[in-house]
Amino acid sequence: MKKVTMFVWNHFTNDARVNRECTALSERYDVNLIAIDDPKDDSIKSFEEINENFKVTRVKRYPMIISCYQHDKTKFLITVGSVTTVIAATFLYYNWILMIYLASVLLMSAALIKVRSLRKRFVNLAIIVRMIKAGYSQNSDIYHSNDLNTLPQGIVCSKLRLKPRKLIYDSHEVQSSRTGYNPKKIKRIEKFLINFVDDMMVENHTRAAHNEEIYGFYPKTLYNYSELYDIEKKPVINLHQQLNLSADEKILLYQGGLQEGRGLELLIEAMDYIDEGTLVFIGGGKLERTLKNLAEESPQRDRIKFIPKVHFKMLPSYTREAYLGFQVLQNICYNHYSASSNKLFEYIMAHVPVVSCNFPEVAQVVNGEQIGLVVDSHNVHQIAKAANTLVKDENLQRKFSENCRQAKLKYNWEIEKTKLYDTYSQLEQKKSKHIELTFSRFTKDGETHA
């Protein structure tokens, strides 16, 4: 059985897409996923065996010196200061040049620890080095990098060898157009690094066309559909009881990261105009505190609830409790505009109608399958109007819910994963590429030249 090493820049515990890919590949390959440890969560293990052919290795997040500093800053500084004083005095006695050298090293080290931006770069570099060390030693036949932040690791492990290995770049986002990133800088980096990959996958055809426009080739597509399952067979969780809601209260659900550009502030504002139901957020993220403050200030505060992040294996049990689901991404970058949104397919799989944005990939599914209402996601009143339509018209809600039962047979991972198998099978038949700076191996449909 051939070996696959995959990299992902997270803890993996809530990454449903990577879990689906690794699990599917483990049916044909020996899969090793290299992720990042979380020192704040004791339940996350440094090594985990998901199944016989799928194992997870998590590298340490922080170098030892950073860990000691974070554990007890005062004790760390006193200890380091005392040791440094003794060493400096010794060096001064023998050689003042050595003392100056030591002082310079200490100043640079202090800057790495105390200056947040430098500390972050130092930590990230240490993670990259650990990932490379772990991945290189596995000596796999195929390396698979999820997103741009693990592509350098994949390149080093696959190409810096006497006998180069094959490398797949699996880009889940539009790396050159995301919030919080320098688009010009990222574009230059990505354009350079993709010269070294043997094949590339993106989430959908909208993004593949965009990739062709900026980089000159059309990669393969692998949609982020949910696994096909019978929602009735999932464990039952009484979310109404958990939230102290009456059994007939309609849950208006948002599940996913509490991040910028997802229209979450507008959902809270829209509750002023939604006549019935309780808005429930499931997830965590950078906006969590802000959203809770907004909810507390809202006249509808009693109708807005928060639930912490739920493990992806348990999430369907929560999703099924919803009357409708929100997916109202904001058009703040091309990454959002072009998204297919895995949350949309999670709603579909649980037979939950949606109120969604009108972006191409999302609207095509919602309108085409008639599973919900499409709105201008920047317009609070349109969001509220659509929610009220579904809340008041239970027959329409049931119709959309029934349509979800049919749509799930079309948009599911059991069908989509065959494209992943095809990509790997085609890659196996080709010789590994040596480092070369050319796009000539890619054709219009994403296939590769022999």
Give names to the regions the model predicted.
Residues 21, 122-137, 152, 160, ...:
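Membrane-proximal helix-turn-helix segments that form the acceptor-binding/catalytic region
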Residues 35, 57, 176, 191-238, ...:
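Donor nucleotide-sugar binding/catalytic pocket of nucleotide-sugar-dependent glycosyltransferases
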Residues 245-272, 280, 401, 420:
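Conserved donor-binding/catalytic core segment of Leloir-type glycosyltransferases
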Residues 303, 319-338, 352:
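Acidic donor-binding loop of glycosyltransferase active sites
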Residues 368-369, 373-380, 389-395:
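Conserved acidic donor-binding segment of nucleotide-sugar-dependent glycosyltransferases
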